[in-house]
Amino acid sequence: MNSISVSVTHGLIFSILLFVISVAGIIINRRNILILLMSIELMLLAVNTNFLIFANMHQQAMGGVFVFFIMAVAAAETAIGLAIVVAIFRKRKTIDLSKLNTLRG
């Protein structure tokens, strides 16, 4: 087994571990909206890691381009998500999802 396949294997194990931790964070803690946002960002990090690993394995630059666009979208998503959380906190004085029901008038 050469060194490139070992590094790809380790990278994929790391990426899978990140993805499983983020899914566990979403499943275990559904009440805190900030932890949900962080878990979603961790999931996007796992996907970015996969893109970089496979792009490096096939010597393609497009993987890096995809990662750049995913990071830009993730930054915009985080900014909008945090702005919504701050607005909800200012109005309701809580970020606990079980106490928030914005569909009721």
Curated annotation (Swiss-Prot):
One of its GO terms (molecular function) is NADH:ubiquinone reductase (non-electrogenic) activity. The keyword Nucleotide-binding does not apply. It is a multi-pass membrane protein. Its EC number is 7.1.1.-. Gene3D superfamilies: 1.10.287.3510. GO terms for biological process: ATP synthesis coupled electron transport. NDH-1 is composed of 14 different subunits. Subunits NuoA, H, J, K, L, M, N constitute the membrane sector of the complex. NDH-1 shuttles electrons from NADH, via FMN and iron-sulfur (Fe-S) centers, to quinones in the respiratory chain. The immediate electron acceptor for the enzyme in this species is believed to be ubiquinone. Couples the redox reaction to proton translocation (for every two electrons transferred, four hydrogen ions are translocated across the cytoplasmic membrane), and thus conserves the redox energy in a proton gradient. This is NADH-quinone oxidoreductase subunit K. It comes from Francisella tularensis subsp. holarctica (strain LVS).
